[in-house]
């Protein structure tokens, strides 16, 4: 029954999306090493992803990726009746990459603005947020660097942006890219738990009941790190994960590691979907089925965009507060 209701809600959301001013479309995408083609001397990854580096990441390849990202976002716009209002991104080298994405492609006509800060990540990659100026504007931004065993980690910062929508409503957006499983899943689990703890401390400091936290958490919804979120945030990917869906494919298995977490008040007015973009999907040559069309297969350039599919959160803002209403009814 729950599944039927979820499907009905999603269809109703989509059918009126283009005309509904109370709707909001949020997107997140890990863009797999989205570097420019210039070696600026900022680290090994910067050198690797340059015209003369081991990846032979040339200007033409960079612009091919920019065009493919723009085409993907516009495909999403066609599918959902509007361009994403907010876009969280991971694995971005610098602000210049985003500036070129927004100004050298068809995205230039959509008036996206950039929120990005450099982090101390050892690979030289950051998270970022794009937003449409016609939909909202920033109130303030903040960063939080995850700590582990009393020390700041050399990983991506957690980005927080408070937005004021056109009608004056405010909403908090958080973008994450938690530590990978490099070194082993069990050995690295503590770092992801620490990153999640940092994210929850940020959420607690906001005094807000309208939080949307998104990102690549490098863990599935049943991992230990998500026990920290259970009392305060609703995981919109949990049901999709239980159905066997995912955003990346490894050794023939789908893993749901990209997801949205929302405040309880936003739970009943939001639906998450994985966007399997047709032209960014290829056949898995080692296993049966399909997989995302990534930029590199090992060291070999193959011309795709990412090993992750983007995810979408559909929000019907006129349904905000339904959670509080029903919670109140249950208490009486």
Each predicted region: which residue ranges?
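Active-site environment of divalent metal-dependent phosphoester hydrolases
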Residues: 94-96, 122-124, 181-183, 218-224, ...
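N-terminal, active-site-proximal structural segment of metallo-dependent hydrolase catalytic domains
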Residues: 16-105, 115-119, 125, 197, ...
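Extracytoplasmic, non-cytosolic globular domains
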Residues: 116, 159-243
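Sec-dependent N-terminal signal peptides
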Residues: 4-15
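Structured beta-strand-rich core segments of catalytic domains in phosphoester-bond hydrolases
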Residues: 86, 92-170
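Second-shell loop/turn segments in exported
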Residues: 52-62, 83-89, 116-117, 147-149, ...
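Metal-dependent phosphoester-hydrolase catalytic domains
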Residues: 18-19, 201-211, 219-332
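Beta-strand-turn-beta hairpins that frame and shape the catalytic cleft
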Residues: 19-26, 35, 134-137, 153-179, ...
């Amino acid at each position: 029954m729950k599944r039927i209701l979820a499907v009905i809600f999603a269809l109703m959301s989509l059918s009126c999306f283009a005309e509904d001013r109370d709707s909001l479309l949020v997107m997140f995408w890990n863009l797999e090493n989205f570097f420019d083609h210039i070696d600026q001397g900022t680290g090994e990854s910067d050198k690797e992803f340059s015209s003369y580096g081991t990846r032979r990441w040339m200007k033409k390849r960079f612009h091919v990726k920019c065009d493919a990202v723009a085409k993907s976002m516009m495909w999403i716009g066609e599918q959902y009746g509007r361009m994403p209002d907010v876009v969280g991104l991971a694995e971005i080298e610098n602000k210049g990459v985003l500036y070129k994405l927004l100004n050298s492609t068809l995205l230039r006509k959509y008036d996206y603005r950039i929120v990005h800060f450099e982090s101390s990540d050892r690979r030289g990659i950051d998270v970022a947020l794009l937003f449409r100026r016609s939909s909202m504007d920033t109130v303030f931004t903040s960063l939080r660097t995850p700590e582990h065993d009393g020390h700041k980690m050399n990983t991506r910062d957690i980005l927080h942006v408070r937005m004021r929508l056109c009608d004056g409503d405010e909403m908090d957006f958080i973008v994450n890219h938690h530590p990978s499983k490099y070194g082993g899943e069990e050995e690295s689990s503590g770092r992801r738990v620490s990153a999640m703890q940092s994210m929850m401390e940020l959420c607690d400091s906001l005094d807000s009941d309208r939080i949307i936290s998104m990102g690549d958490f490098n863990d599935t919804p049943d991992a230990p790190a998500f026990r920290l979120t259970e009392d305060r945030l609703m995981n919109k990917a949990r049901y999709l994960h239980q159905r066997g869906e995912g955003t990346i494919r490894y050794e023939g298995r789908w893993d749901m590691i990209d997801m949205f977490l929302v405040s309880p008040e936003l739970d009943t007015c939001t639906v998450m979907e994985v966007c399997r973009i047709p032209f960014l999907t290829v056949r898995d040559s080692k296993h049966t089925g399909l997989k995302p069309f990534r930029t590199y297969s090992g060291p070999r350039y193959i011309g795709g965009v990412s090993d992750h599919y983007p995810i979408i959160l559909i929000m019907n803002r006129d349904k905000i507060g339904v959670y509080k209403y029903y919670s109140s009814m249950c208490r009486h």
